[in-house]
């Protein structure tokens, strides 16, 4: 990867981390202080989605592909968990 795309990728990675931190802060204040966060949370989640979309696009993925792969991973994890539970109770 060339220097310019690498620099942009780094900025996007740091950006998504920062925005995820903003989401965490809002949720903390909501749980701890009862703060109403609905509108602010919508905006911060949009920022996370913005960076996620840019990273996915840089690697040639669509958001549908990302979600599909994630659903498959979660389903496989759930199936393994169920199999372990069934084995433990057999």
Model regions and ranges:
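Flexible "arm" and connector segments at domain edges
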Residues: 1-90
């Amino acid at each position: 990867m060339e220097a310019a795309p690498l620099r942009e990728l780094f900025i996007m990675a740091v950006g998504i981390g920062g925005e995820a931190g903003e989401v965490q802060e809002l949720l903390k204040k909501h749980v701890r202080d009862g703060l109403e966060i609905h509108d602010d949370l919508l905006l911060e989640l949009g920022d996370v989605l913005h960076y996620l979309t840019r990273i996915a696009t840089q690697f040639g993925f669509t958001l549908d592909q990302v979600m599909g792969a994630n659903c498959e991973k979660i389903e496989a994890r759930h199936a393994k968990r169920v199999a372990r539970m069934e084995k433990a109770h057999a």
